[in-house]
Amino acid sequence: MGQSQSGGHGPGGGKKDDKDKKKKYEPPVPTRVGKKKKKTKGPDAASKPPLVTPHTQCRLKLLKLERIKDYLLMEEEFIRNQEQMKPLEEKQEEERSKVDDLRGTPMSVGTLEEIIDDNHAIVSTSVGSEHYVSILSFVDKDLLEPGCSVLLNHKVHAVIGVLMDDTDPLVTVMKLEKAPQETYADIGGLDNQIQEIKESVELPLTHPEYYEEMGIKPPKGVILYGPPGTGKTLLAKAVANQTSATFLRVVGSELIQKYLGDGPKLVRELFRVAEEHGPSIVFIDEIDAIGTKRYDSNSGGEREIQRTMLELLNQLDGFDSRGDVKVIMATNRIETLDPALIRPGRIDRKIEFPLPDEKTKKRIFQIHTSRMTLADDVTLDELIMAKDDLSGADIKAICTEAGLMALRERRMKVTNEDFKKSKENFLYKKTEGTPEGLYL
């Protein structure tokens, strides 16, 4: 029995055990999630660019950029259309402003009336209006003083600069740069008048110590009066030629200005320039244009003329001493002048210029005929001895007319007959030939 059981586990039972050993448990293969990963094929596959699939994202980006480009083109076209739709006036104004910015804007000139503080002032323009304006920060405040000329912005009138040379151009023109050619030798007669004007004007400028030793003050000014053509202006020219002083010549009518206050301002400028360039002589011809007697007037122009004369009175005899400034006035209507203008202290000497006498007439004829070619029969005694009221200018006109008569007949010498005819023609035109009031 025992052998039979053990025999049951013999060679047949060993085969079944081998089969059991081969059928061991193995876990299931895990399920793959996602795409199947491709196997790389070494370093060659790593160097190649990856394939992008699909192409949908790149195309969407391209379409988006194209749409943005279309929007930008539409905006550019819209702006261009808006520019073209602008009014022509606005476009021209914009272009004009650009040109002004490129070449600079003009500046107006005004007068500083009063300084309020460091940044504000009151200025006046040429039309007479006053403005409260600001002073820009770059303006030199040390140069600002009341009465100086300043540069103003043409829009807001702000002070943007200071004019260093604030001399009025009208006063600059009055100053004689070249001395006249006339001398005392060209004046016939008038010896007393020449002596008086030398004592009053020329000697105080050249030798003021003489008056200091005498203990007297030299005259401030003189007035030359007399009929027209007697040599008043000629004597003033001779004084300008004889002295080396600055000579300022002005006609009374030039001191009458259009705008209110310009006349007195011009008088102040005239004497200020004369004092700066001293010693100097101020010659005011035809002073009766502004120096007439004052009266109550309703006219604004007449009141302005009177204010100009009052400023002249102040300059002649004010608190400030004139120093080396001498004044010469000339008029042929001294009776119409205001007494305050020609009183002692302002005009200390009055020099009269009468019509020439026989001796003076002879001297004047000799001066005007010295350069003329005269015939042998010329005798001027008849012309000199005549009782006609001839002035120095009349004698010069007679000599000139005689020379023209000789030229008319193609002669190079002036005869005595030419002088007679020229005198007759001149006197006829002076007295009877020209109706009174023809040229008024």
UniProtKB/Swiss-Prot annotation:
Q: Where in the cell is it found?
A: Cytoplasm; Nucleus
Checking InterPro entries in the record gives:
26S_Proteasome_ATPase, AAA+_ATPase, AAA_lid_3, ATPase_AAA_core, ATPase_AAA_CS, NA-bd_OB-fold, P-loop_NTPase, Prot_ATP_ID_OB_2nd
Q: Sorted alphabetically, which CDD domains does this protein's record hold?
A: RecA-like_PAN_like
Compositionally biased, Basic and acidic residues: which spans? 14-26, 86-103
Q: Which GO terms describe its biological process?
A: proteasome-mediated ubiquitin-dependent protein catabolic process
In which residue ranges is the amino acid composition biased (Gly residues)?
1-13
Question: In its keyword annotation, does this UniProt entry include Transmembrane?
Answer: no
One of its Pfam families is AAA_lid_3
Region annotation Disordered: where it falls in the sequence: 1-53, 84-105
Q: What are the UniProt keywords, alphabetically?
A: ATP-binding, Cytoplasm, Nucleotide-binding, Nucleus, Proteasome
Entry-linked Gene3D superfamilies: 1.10.8.60, Nucleic acid-binding proteins, P-loop containing nucleotide triphosphate hydrolases
Q: Where does it sit, as one GO cellular component term?
A: nucleus
Query: Which Gene Ontology MF annotations are present?
Result: ATP binding; ATP hydrolysis activity; proteasome-activating activity
SUPFAM superfamilies, A to Z: P-loop containing nucleoside triphosphate hydrolases (SSF52540)
Q: Which residues bind ATP?
A: G226, P227, P228, G229, T230, G231, K232, T233
Q: In UniProt terms, what function does this protein have? A: The 26S proteasome is involved in the ATP-dependent degradation of ubiquitinated proteins. The regulatory (or ATPase) complex confers ATP dependency and substrate specificity to the 26S complex.
Q: Which family does it belong to?
A: Belongs to the AAA ATPase family.
Family matches, as PANTHER family = 26S PROTEASOME REGULATORY SUBUNIT
Q: What is this protein called?
A: 26S proteasome regulatory subunit 4
What is the organism of origin for this protein?
Answer: Gallus gallus (Chicken)
